[in-house]
A protein has these predicted regions:
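Short, glycine-/Ser/Thr-/acidic-enriched flexible segments
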Residues: 37, 171-173, 180-182, 211, ...
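Catalytic core of carbohydrate-active enzymes
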Residues: 414-416, 420-425, 432-444, 465-475, ...
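N-terminal accessory segment at the very beginning of proteins
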Residues: 1-233, 239-241, 246-254, 265, ...
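Beta-sheet entry/capping signal
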Residues: 29, 72, 165-166, 172-175, ...
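Conserved, mostly hydrophobic/aromatic
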Residues: 22, 70, 166, 256, ...
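Active-site-proximal helices and loops of the catalytic beta/alpha 8
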Residues: 74-75, 270-273, 280, 284-339, ...
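Aromatic-lined carbohydrate-binding/catalytic grooves of carbohydrate-active enzymes
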Residues: 227-391, 437
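The substrate-binding groove and active-site-proximal loops of carbohydrate-active enzymes
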Residues: 204-208, 233-246, 273-287, 339-359, ...
Length: 665
């Protein structure tokens, strides 16, 4: 009996109602799909169409092999039960990944389809686990964990959690779960198990590479690359919750200019609008936004405005959007997805009609005034109740397609801006999924707490996001929640975080600083309040001197930072990199979670423990390392104790590169 066949460039297996297809998908890469009682779909949630490949396919009676460059898949019928097992190898014949066997009398299934109402399935895909394997990427989870081996991760978005189902393995491969369904992944010591709570087919992509950088380049080619970061993305961004009127925005920008402190972007936060979903300035608080934006441009400052996907039932656009089916639907109950200053539904970013409609509003009320960059907040979106099974998008149920929402939100603005004649595009966004990078998504890590614990988590998050194919990433410097401006301990945390932020892809000061002041309109109605001052001069002279010094350092690095953005644009390389990204042959580098590389040349060791004035730093083997503070040179492959009084940050120059920084930090 013939189980295997070649169909064009793909290897096909059929048995017992299941169809499995393995196809070449880019250099050294394969895409595997499987369906039960259904035809395979060519639709891909994340992958772009690949360049033409010439695979080698070998067909046998009970085994077949497909080879594409450095990777080959072996499809074997097991002797017990006629279950198919798929194994992936590199060009050296080393096993990369293998489905679980059927276990003989256990009758296990590596690809398990459990029927749901309609034509969907609850899908489980199980692979054998190599105990020595280390796993990195998967997006952004709020945990102080670098090696994800042993972790259970929810494949769903929440405020400060961005699920991007791609990982880089220490065994020399990258794996993308090409499925936008809500689910879970368990990187166990015995098996790795992926679940999708509702889907039509199994779909994943795997690539082999000799280095993490090679794997990352393959992933960028498969899912897209970031645009080139505009020049105003390279410097310092000022933000707070919230500048609530026009004069306040202008006074802050004027003060930066007066003090001769470089400022690239100032951000106007939420509720500058009358109601969510109006997507325009409230004329009472912003009477002449065009004049405001013009003056900011004359000061050399870009204006960024906050956008929310929420549409208040009182919004001037709500009834039309409801009538035109441009809002997210609830499967049961009322269509209220967020309760915040009233009842709100979310605009459906997966609907092309919605994307066109919302962009036209934002073009008319923002872009036509001169605004070129947007802050796409609440991008998960942030349901008041995360009952994923109760919501439905144009693209399908949230259980089946929900994770694409933040990418389509980014797409809405990117495509609108491109049509409007804008080339280099960056929009700040609170979440992402596979492919978001190609739509100019600069992800920040969400509404995190102002604590050292959360600070440490962000270092891991930044490393993982870079390895997940998102080179543009940042945080709220100082954290978002519960930072009391007058508290000396918070000031210390802010300074240490500010130093870290200098060496992030984008340097942005933000937070909801306490105490909080209520704001009322002329009619006496309560509006969204404002936190206390959050500018670099707001925290006393010592903090001011340190923070302005580090803004100066950021400016000194502008050419270098621009070159890193060029690498991200052309090759998909992260800006913030794990040590092992540049030094994969040094085994210690695979475990360092509290230091990182800013590009290839700068090793950054944040001070992320309260009252610490020194720390241990590992310097990777294979290079010499110059202390940017003192000029002292160390050989790699050793641990050192780096002193770090409050006004300095341990930064080391690889082989003496970027030596203009010596004595500046």
């Amino acid at each position: 009996m013939q189980y295997f066949e070649r169909q064009n460039d793909s290897l096909i297996f059929r048995l017992n109602g299941e169809t499995v297809m393995v196809s070449p998908w880019g250099k050294d890469s394969l895409r595997t799909r499987a369906a039960l009682f259904n035809e395979l779909s060519d639709n891909s949630p994340a992958l772009l169409s690949p360049a033409k490949s010439e695979p080698v396919i070998e067909l046998g009676e009970r085994q077949a092999v497909i080879t594409n460059g450095k990777i080959h898949a072996v499809l074997s019928l097991q002797d017990w039960g006629d279950e198919l097992q798929i194994s992936y190898y590199n060009q050296k014949g080393e096993l990369l990944l293998q489905e679980i066997p059927n276990g003989g009398a256990l009758f296990l299934k590596a690809r398990r389809f459990q029927s749901l109402p309609g034509d969907s399935f609850f899908l489980t895909a199980s692979f054998l686990s190599n105990p020595s394997e280390k796993i990195y990427g998967m997006g952004q989870y709020q945990q102080e964990t670098l090696n994800l081996k042993g972790c259970n991760l929810e494949l769903a978005h929440r405020n400060s959690q961005a699920s991007i189902p791609f990982y880089v393995s220490s065994l020399g491969y990258g794996f993308l779960w090409n499925n936008a369904a809500v689910g879970d992944v368990h990187f166990g010591t015995n098996t790795t198990q992926w679940t999708a709570r509702s889907c039509k087919q199994l779909d994943y992509w795997i690539t082999a590479g000799d280095t993490p950088a090679e794997i990352e380049e393959a992933y960028a080619n498969a899912t897209g690359k970031s645009p080139m970061m505009p020049e105003y993305g390279l410097g310092f961004w000022q933000c707070k919750l919230r500048y609530y009127n026009q004069e306040q925005v202008l006074s802050i920008a004027r003060e930066y200019k007066k003090r001769n402190i470089p400022l690239d972007v100032i951000v106007i936060d939420f509720y500058h609008w009358p109601y969510c979903g109006d997507w325009r300035f409230d004329e009472e608080f912003f009477p002449d936004p065009a004049a405001m934006i013009k003056e900011l441009q004359e000061l050399g400052v870009e204006t960024m405005v906050s956008i929310w996907p929420a549409v208040d039932f009182r919004s001037e656009n709500y009834e039309e959007m409801k009538q035109q089916n441009m809002l997210v639907k609830s499967n049961s109950g009322v269509d209220v997805q967020m309760i915040f200053h009233g009842n709100n539904a979310f605009m459906d970013a997966t609907n092309p009609k919605t994307r066109r409609y919302v962009w036209e509003k934002c073009k008319q009320n923002y872009a036509d005034l001169g605004i070129r960059t947007f802050w796409l907040d609440v991008a998960e979106p942030e349901y008041t109740s995360y009952d994923f099974e109760n919501y439905r998008y144009y693209s399908g149920t949230v259980l089946e397609t929900g994770n694409i929402y933040p990418r389509e939100y980014a797409r809405l603005f990117y495509e609108g801006q491109k049509e409007n004649g804008q080339d280099d595009i960056v929009n700040l966004i609170r979440c992402a999924w596979a492919g978001s990078q190609r739509y100019g998504a600069l992800v920040w890590s969400g509404d995190i707490m102002s604590t050292y614990e959360d600070f440490r988590k962000q270092i891991c998050a930044g490393i993982h996001m870079g390895l997940s194919g998102i080179p543009w990433w940042t945080t709220d410097i100082g954290g978002f929640h519960n930072g009391v401006a007058a508290d000396p301990d918070f000031k210390e945390l802010l300074i240490r975080w500010f130093q870290f932020g200098t060496f992030c892809p984008v340097m942005r000061l933000h937070g909801s600083r306490q105490p909080y002041t209520p704001i009322y309109n002329k009619a006496g109605e309560l509006r969204e309040g404002t936190g206390t001052d959050n500018e670099v001069w707001s925290y006393g002279e010592e903090a001011y001197q340190i923070m302005t010094k580090f803004i100066h350092v950021r400016e000194l690095m502008r050419d270098y930072t621009r070159s890193l953005m060029q690498q991200a644009h052309e090759n998909g390389h992260p800006v913030l990199r794990a040590l092992f990204y540049e030094f994969p042959s040094d085994p210690i580098c695979w475990d360092i979670k509290n230091s990182y590389l800013f590009g290839s040349d700068l090793l950054v060791a944040p001070i992320c423990h309260e009252h610490a004035v020194d720390r241990q730093v590992y310097l990777p083997a294979g290079a010499s390392w110059t202390d940017a503070r003192t000029g002292v040179v160390y050989e790699g492959g050793q641990w050192i104790t780096a002193n770090a009084p409050m006004d300095t940050l341990p930064v080391f120059l690889r082989d003496g590169r970027q030596d203009y920084l010596i004595g500046e930090i």
